[in-house]
Each structure stands twice: as C-alpha cells, then as structure tokens.
Amino acid sequence: LPFSVNAELRRAFNEGRVRYTDLNLSDNACQLRQGITGQMDWGIVEACHLERIEGGMVRVYLTAGIGIAPTIFRLAREGVFVELNAWHGHHLMGIHDIYEIEDPWFRSPVLITHPMEKIGRPYVEVPAYRIRGIVHTDLPDEARSMTAPTEVTRRIGANVAEFLRWNMQRGYIYRDKLILQSGVGSGANAVLGALGDSPDVPNFHIYTEVLQEEPLRLIREGRVVSASTGALTISSEHLKEVYQNMDEYRGRLLLRPSEISNCPEIIARLGICSLNTALEVDIYGHVNSTKVCGSRMMNGVGGSADFTNNAMLSIFTCASTAKNGCISSIVPFCSHVDHTEHYVDAIATEYGVADLRGLCATERAEALIAIAHPDYRPILRAYYDLARRNGGHTPHNLRAAFAMHDTYLRKGDMRLTCWEEYL
C-alpha cells in the first residue's frame, strides 16, 4: 500500500498495526508484477459497467480511480471480485485510457506526447473466469470536501503565479505549453485554484495523479484546457455534479492507471511544472513531505517524487507555520527527507518564493530564511551563524540541527528554541 489518506489507516501505520512501505506510485504495479512484494491472492476492483464479448472475455469499465486495476486483474492468483457500483452509472465510460507498461528490460517507450493523447483502451479486457464474483452496490465515493481557501493559501497561490509569470517572461516556460501537476490536499487544491484565477497565468493543461475540486471548476471555466489524471478525488456531491454535466468534461478529461499518470518518462517528455506540498523544508532545500517530526506518517510520498524528480520545474508550497505558529515549516535540518536538494527547484510560502536553481548551499540558506515566517527568521539566522563556525560547503552544527524539533516536543513551541542549550 504506497499511499493512503484514510485517518484510521494512518493511525494503524503509526501504531504498528499495519505494515506500511512508502513507495513511489510509479513503481507500485511494476514491483507487484516482479513479485518483489509477494504474491497477490485476491483482488477487489470497482467498476461501473461489465460487457461480455466473444471468446469468453469481459470488458470492465472502471470508475473514478484507476490505480493498478489492470495489474490486479492479471496477477491475483485466485481471481478478482468486482464491485459493480450503480452510483457511478455509465457516465465515465469512454473517459479512461487503460495501458500497462512493459516490464524491464529493454521495454518499449510509452509514447504519450500530449496530456490528452490515448495509447490504450477505455476498458480492461479480462477472461471471464478471472472474475470470481460480482457484488452489486449503489454507494457514493467517500472523499471529503476540500476546506475553503485561506488568506495564506491565496497569498501562496499569488506568489506562485508571479513566479510562473517571471519564468515565462524570460522564456524558461512557454505560455502556450504550460502543463501543471498538483499534489493532494486542501492546500494544493487552493493554490491551483489561485493560479487559475490569476490573470498572470495563461490557460493551461494538467497532467497529474489526482484531480481535486478546483481543477474541475477551472475546466468548466475554460482555464484548464485538458486534464489527465489517475483519479478524481472529490466529494460525492462534486462528483455527482461532474456526472450530471459530463458533456462539459468529455474530450477534456482523461483517467489513466497510476503507472501512466506518474510515469517518469512521460513527465520528463511533457515538460511539466510540478506543484507539491511540503511538511517542512530545511535551509538547504531538502523537503520532508511525509513524516511529522521525522516519525509519524501522514499519507505517504505518493507521486510527489515521480513528478519532482522528472519535472522541468519543481515547486513545493507550504504555509510558513503550522499549529498556530508553534511550528516553523522552514527548519535548520529536515527531520526526514523525501526530496533532496538536487530535485527541488523552488519553495513558495505566503512570504515569497525562494528560487533555488543555480544557487550554492549558503545562497540557498539566505533565500529560504527570507521566506520563513518573521517570528522564525532570527531563530533560523542564529542557527545558520552557529553552523557557519564549523565551515564546510553545507554548514551544519549536528548538536543543534534538530533543536527546533526538540524544543517543540519538549515545550510545544519552536519559538522557545534556545541555541545555548545545544552548544
């Protein structure tokens, strides 16, 4: 299980009741096919329609999330149970592009050169004997509604919009070829909405792993030209609205398996600008996007590394503080690292954008301290001055590197950090 937003599962991960392996989404299906994660006995796949055809085959039309369904149908040793969910109706038929990547070695290229280019079929075709049972349901999806944008997320969105405008002005991004990816969560949803509302950002395409509520609004308004995704992660009310107005989305919306939506080869070829959310960023540009204080799992890395490592321009966004200001999102040293400095191009908070491209370690530190919350800038500056006494290309004081985290765990507020305690 490489990614989950379920609160009960998150508790189980952190309590050790469920063994959880954090994995890039692009690798999940391939590792299953190679047998690295063991044998799959049974599979459960949701569908909106089944069509029996000649030769003892069945066409399975999937619903709003594809994941690794094609691989499950092929690999489940005992077979697959299909949940035939009438709630979805037949609205999504024709929206999918189902294709399984060849396994190594010397596999063929995945020839997608445009976000809406199709290379597969709109269904999964399987032998009828592989379907061991059909369960009829009529249940809406369980995804929650996004929280409303805040002043902080609007400011972050405005800063990212200005940063994109600056890049387009200099020819680093072509206005007529802007393709965005956006990560999961209310913050990412709000930032993408702010970009869509900005006059500085031209109409754009989306190629991403998950599509949330704001991109669908932008499709209706014509700001998003097309959107390719692996899943529609929206509330049942919003999904019902999509189904009722499917003609507005057909031809502009495409659903793919996760190994295609997150395929590094395609991401690099399309020249995507990635937008993902950071839990914390250290002063040299490393990003933690999964573990609170280095230990407690949030949701998993998902596809953020797939996009960050292969995007033409990779941006991470975060509010400068959390927990009513008691936690700084910019710290001396990340308590866990998911994305190293080598792949992180820019960090955006409500106080600005730190463009890290072409900067040495000390220049990165200056740029990132400048966009930290004002309450934390002197604290971070004090650490940086302390670390520089040790010299080196990337100055650190290992006794003090996690002092802000330690102070929060002991006193409940990073602002109470006293560097003298760590000398």
Predicted regions and their residues:
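Conserved alpha/beta enzyme-core scaffold
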Residues: 1-423
